[in-house]
């Protein structure tokens, strides 16, 4: 991993329908909500609300970045009471964007509230309902539940070289809830992979 940091990234642009809360996503990552694609953007974050889907202008913006090979990632807002969920949004984005990878899945509490994530790389869980978030290794039952998802993810990653995200050829989808902080650290890890402009 390079020694660059999130602070070295000059321009983080956020795109997406207003229902996906792009303003709060921008605030979480020091970005700017935009409606224009261009080569001056260091990374493009596309915010998606599973309940609203993906509108035409957002799809066109995604495609506009192809010529610049801009690093792009998708953040999917996961909140209480949503009928559509992270998996639904990823399926839709896979059809209208480029194929995405899902390095983390959402974990729900007993009331159905999204409270955590599981890494498909190392099977580490993060519980964001605690302060600070609690990390642990998934139990055997959870590992069995995510087994097929993990195999698919690892197969996708075999084809990718280190730096694929920064090169603009790997497109991660990350669940995010700015209310409880779910996924914010995961997005920041990807942003830290980006080189500075210096």
Predicted features and spans:
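Structural and coupling elements of P-loop NTPases
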Residues: 1-198
């Amino acid at each position: 991993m390079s020694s660059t940091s999130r602070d070295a990234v000059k321009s983080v642009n956020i795109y997406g329908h207003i229902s996906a809360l792009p303003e709060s996503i921008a605030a979480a990552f020091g970005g700017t909500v935009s409606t224009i694609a261009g080569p001056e953007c260091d990374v493009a974050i596309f915010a998606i609300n599973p309940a609203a889907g993906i509108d035409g202008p957002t799809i066109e913006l995604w495609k506009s970045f192809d010529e610049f090979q801009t690093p792009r990632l998708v953040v999917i807002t996961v909140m209480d009471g949503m009928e559509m969920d992270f998996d639904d949004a990823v399926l839709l984005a896979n059809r209208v964007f480029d194929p995405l990878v899902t390095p983390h899945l959402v974990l729900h509490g007993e009331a159905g509230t999204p409270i955590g994530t599981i890494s498909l790389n190392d099977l580490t869980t993060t519980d964001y309902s605690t302060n600070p978030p609690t990390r642990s290794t998934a139990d055997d039952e959870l590992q069995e539940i995510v087994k097929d998802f993990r195999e698919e993810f690892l197969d996708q990653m075999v084809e990718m070289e280190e730096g694929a995200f920064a090169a603009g050829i790997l497109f991660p989808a990350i669940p995010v809830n700015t209310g409880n902080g779910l996924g914010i650290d995961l997005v920041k890890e990807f942003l830290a992979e980006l080189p500075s402009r210096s």
